[in-house]
Structure formats: structure tokens, C-alpha cells
């Protein structure tokens, strides 16, 4: 499920960081399919508990409880990535240079896009909160860097995911991340949108 995917992602980050210099980028869209895997698993658990306790639950109640537990799992998974990156030191004693890419249009369908939006929302909320240092004080972590892509679905106040853009702006005001990329401008300049933290310094593809 989603938690397992997040754990594996952090292990990959650690392995790559220990065997190379320079940065690495991950896209939250790669984690999005695992949200539905967890949803289905949690739903089965809720139905089994309902039967075991002999409590009749409506479809609406089952769906509501499933989504609540799912949200908790997404929150834990995002926290795992944040804290692992913050506490991880590479073999040369540095924190890994990790960039997290938030791009709704990488989702393969509408359900996956909604699930990706849930991960992005949680990532931004946790970054706004910050992380606790050794003294228990909430601080701004240096990594992972965040990049948020502006697109038709989130750029105007009547677009379905505009609330994420507002949350991103709030996060930038407090934590100086994320950075922003325009899907439209990037496609015009480069022909595609790249998951890279050094976007405008990379050579054009041949």
C-alpha cells in the first residue's frame, strides 16, 4: 500500500544519495497509484470489522471511515519521506539533495489525480508545519525541495485544484518553498515538463 511505497521510496533515496554526488528528484505522481491500493485494503478491513462486531454500516459510513483511515495513512507516509530525508546523512556526511515534484497532470486518470491531490495537500501542510529539531522547536527543513507545477486544473480561482495553489502560496510565504513552474511556459520552451530542480540550467534535449 501507500505506506510501503513511501518506505521503499526513502530507501531508494538513501541508496542513490550514498552512491552519487548531486541531486535527485522524485515525483509524487509515482506514489499516487498506491493510494487506491491502500483504499481497497482499508475498505476490506472496515467491512470485515463491521461483520465481526455485528454492526450494520451503510455504504456511506463504510466509505467515510475508509477515507478517514486512508487520509491517516497518507499523512504517515508523507511524514516518513519528510523525516527520513531530514535525518538521513549520506556517506560523505551531507543531507541528500532531494527535490519533490508536484504535478497533477502526471496522473493517468481522474481518480489518480484526486489521490495525487491528497498527497500534494498533505505534503504542503506538513511543510507549513515544519519539522522539530533536537530542541523540539519547529524549523524549516532545507530538504526536500518542493516544485509545484501551475496548470489549467489549479491556476484560476474556479479551477478544481486551486485550493492546492492557495496552500502552496501559504507554504511559500512561511517556508520559502515550493518553487513554481508553469506547464504552459515549460512546454512552449522545452516541449515537455521536466522533474528537475535545476530546470533552467539544464541543456536542451537534442
Predicted ranges, named:
Residues 1-197:
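Catalytic cofactor-binding cores of redox enzymes
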Residues 200-205:
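Conserved small/polar residues in nucleotide/adenosyl-binding loops
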Amino acid at each position: 500500500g501507500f505506506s510501503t511505497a513511501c518506505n521503499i521510496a526513502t530507501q531508494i533515496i538513501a541508496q542513490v544519495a550514498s552512491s552519487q554526488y548531486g541531486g535527485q528528484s522524485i515525483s509524487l505522481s509515482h506514489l499516487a497509484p498506491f493510494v487506491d491500493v491502500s483504499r481497497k485494503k482499508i475498505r476490506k478491513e472496515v467491512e470485515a470489522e463491521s461483520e465481526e462486531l455485528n454492526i450494520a454500516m451503510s455504504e456511506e459510513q463504510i466509505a467515510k471511515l475508509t477515507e478517514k483511515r486512508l487520509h491517516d495513512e497518507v499523512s504517515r507516509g508523507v511524514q516518513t519521506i519528510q523525516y527520513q530525508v531530514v535525518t538521513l546523512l549520506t556517506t560523505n556526511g551531507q543531507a541528500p539533495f532531494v527535490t519533490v515534484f508536484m504535478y497533477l497532470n502526471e496522473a493517468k486518470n481522474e481518480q489518480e489525480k484526486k489521490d495525487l491531490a491528497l498527497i500534494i495537500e498533505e505534503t504542503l501542510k506538513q511543510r507549513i508545519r515544519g519539522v522539530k529539531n533536537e530542541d523540539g522547536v519547529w524549523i524549516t527543513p532545507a530538504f526536500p525541495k518542493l516544485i509545484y507545477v501551475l496548470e489549467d486544473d489549479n491556476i484560476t480561482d474556479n479551477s478544481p485544484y486551486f485550493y492546492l495553489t492557495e496552500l502552496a502560496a501559504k507554504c511559500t510565504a512561511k517556508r520559502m518553498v515550493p518553487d513554481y513552474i508553469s506547464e504552459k511556459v515549460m512546454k512552449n520552451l522545452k516541449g515537455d515538463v521536466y522533474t528537475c530542480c535545476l530546470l533552467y540550467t539544464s541543456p536542451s534535449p537534442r
